[in-house]
A protein has these predicted regions:
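A short beta-strand-loop-beta hairpin characteristic of the jelly-roll/cupin
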Residues: 139-160
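A short glycine-rich, His/Asp/Glu-containing loop-to-beta-strand
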Residues: 101-122
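A structural signal for short, well-ordered beta-strand segments and their strand-loop junctions
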Residues: 37, 114-117, 137, 148-149
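Non-heme Fe(II)/2-oxoglutarate
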Residues: 1-102
Length: 165
């Protein structure tokens, strides 16, 4: 088997990791992670559907994904469909953080939907799943044992301000 790292696409854009980490620390002082009823999962939404604060709560913090829950190997849909394009309003509580600058720069280059800070507890994993569209990832806090797996390739994405698809 030949390993193919093409699924890990480092983008030609980078942010100040110290500023990202400081903005994260500021937000978690006042905001609780929405767990959507899932163990070891947490999200703080930075965007919402304009004028709709309910659009970032419960299952809407996660949105639809596909998984293979049993030995049949068949994919099944989980959670609720989300109209990613509708999440176009940056939440006012976070406008004075570095995340707003990051959002503005990414918005000028990519078509964004929901933008979230995601939390994975130490020694926890997400089960295998497939998202409905490509996702941008910017690791903010991580360690060398933290890896992303795409197909059969595992890779560590360092917290250095890089943006990955």
């Amino acid at each position: 088997m030949t390993l193919n790292l093409d699924d890990f696409q480092k983008q030609d854009i980078k942010f100040d990791i110290a500023k990202l980490q400081q903005a994260y620390k500021e937000i978690v002082k006042t905001q609780k992670f929405e767990d959507a009823g899932v163990t070891n999962f947490g999200a703080i939404s930075l965007t919402q559907i304009p004028g709709d604060p309910e659009s970032i709560k419960g299952s809407k913090a996660r949105g639809v994904f596909w998984t293979k829950p049993d030995q049949s190997g068949k994919e099944v849909s989980r959670d609720i469909d989300i109209n990613e394009e509708a999440y176009s309003e940056f939440i006012k509580d976070y406008e004075n953080t570095y995340f707003k600058e990051v959002y503005d720069k990414l918005s000028s280059k990519y078509k964004l939907g929901r933008v979230r800070i995601l939390l994975k507890q130490p020694r926890s994993t997400l089960s295998w799943h497939r998202d409905p569209e490509p996702r941008l990832h910017i690791p903010i806090i991580t360690n060398p044992g933290c890896i992303m797996v795409i197909d059969k390739v595992a890779q560590h994405m360092p917290a250095d301000g890089s943006v990955w698809i």
